[in-house]
A protein has these predicted regions:
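Acidic, divalent-metal-coordinating active-site segment for phosphoryl/phosphodiester hydrolysis
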Residues: 159-169
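Active-site-facing substrate-recognition patch
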Residues: 17-83, 91-96, 100, 107, ...
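Residue-level marker for buried hydrophobic side chains located in beta-strands
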Residues: 153-155
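Metal-dependent phosphoesterase core characteristic of DEDDh/y 3'-5' exonuclease domains
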Residues: 113-116
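Flanking scaffold residues of small Cys/His-coordinated metal-binding clusters
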Residues: 13
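Short, well-ordered alpha-helices that flank and scaffold nucleotide-derived cofactor binding pockets
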Residues: 107-111, 167-174
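Short cysteine-rich clusters marking metal-coordination/redox-active sites
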Residues: 1-9, 18-21
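Cofactor-binding loop segments of dinucleotide-utilizing enzymes, especially the Rossmann-like FAD-
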Residues: 158, 180-183
């Protein structure tokens, strides 16, 4: 059977993800109302995505930047209508990695991705407690000399774990809508009433 599958893959010149791997992406495709702002969630965050994000971001496997959105190229048409603004890594993390993961991921949709935020302190959110994460508004700042195009604003991020970063950014930039690649199952569960 695997020989047949491999033979079929031979005919897909632009295939970035094999059909077996593609099945591991747990589609969620849900819209949440967060204080009157729509938040679009593409995937449910799970162990597969956790490993993939780690390999991409921390092991600097930059070729993976295209796999997250390659099967959702219909988003290009939608994203082009907006000024796409992403959340940022800390300066230290950006220097260590040598790239800005969210910018590169969303740039795969052929849109220019703005980076109007900065982190006042270097805080690793994945190891922070929920109460520390809720204080992200004290850590996130908006660049003063960073003019944005006169378009509707789409705020994007890679993962929504508790939603604290998105809420802090929302207060600073007042987006028309928000989009994340993946949301943590606990966040999804806690926000069922916001669908």
């Amino acid at each position: 059977m695997s020989e047949i599958r491999n033979f079929e893959i031979f005919f897909y010149n632009d295939l970035l993800i094999c059909p077996d791997c593609s099945k591991n992406f747990k589609l969620h495709k849900q819209v949440y109302n967060i204080d009157g702002i729509p938040l679009y969630v593409l995937y449910e965050y799970d162990e597969f995505l956790e490993r993939l994000f780690f390999q991409y971001k921390e092991q600097r496997d930059v070729v993976l930047k295209d796999v997250f959105l390659c099967e959702h190229l219909y988003l290009k048409k939608i994203f082009k209508k907006y000024c796409v603004c992403t959340l940022c890594s800390s300066d230290a993390k950006r220097m260590e990695r040598g790239f800005e993961p969210a910018i590169d991921m969303y740039s795969s949709l052929d849109v220019f991705v703005q980076s109007p935020f900065y982190k006042k302190k270097d805080i690793k959110q994945s190891s922070a407690t929920k109460s520390k994460r809720s204080q992200i508004n004290n850590v996130l700042g908006l660049k003063q000399l960073y003019p944005l195009p006169k378009k509707k604003i789409l705020l994007v991020d890679d993962v929504c774990t508790t939603g604290s970063t998105l809420l802090a950014a929302k207060q600073l930039i007042h987006p028309d809508c928000m989009f994340v690649l993946a949301a943590h199952p606990l966040w999804i569960l806690a926000n069922q009433e916001n669908i």
